[in-house]
């Protein structure tokens, strides 16, 4: 339920951080 959604959101957040680091 909500916990799984939280985990997915965390994964997306981590991916965005990685992409931002890579772009800079």
Curated annotation (Swiss-Prot):
Keywords: Amphibian defense peptide, Antibiotic, Antimicrobial, Cytolysis, Fungicide, Hemolysis, Immunity, Innate immunity, Secreted. InterPro entries: Antimicrobial_19. Transmembrane segments: none annotated. The keyword Ribonucleoprotein does not apply. The keyword Secreted applies. One of its GO terms (cellular component) is extracellular region. Expressed by the skin glands. Its main location: secreted. GO terms for biological process: defense response to bacterium; defense response to fungus; innate immune response; killing of cells of another organism; xenobiotic metabolic process. It is found in: Secreted. Pfam families: Antimicrobial19 (PF08225). Antimicrobial peptide with activity against fungus (C.albicans) and Gram-positive and Gram-negative bacteria (S.aureus and E.coli). Also has low hemolytic activity against human erythrocytes. Belongs to the frog skin active peptide (FSAP) family. Pseudin subfamily. This is Pseudin-2. The lineage of its organism: Eukaryota, Metazoa, Chordata, Craniata, Vertebrata.
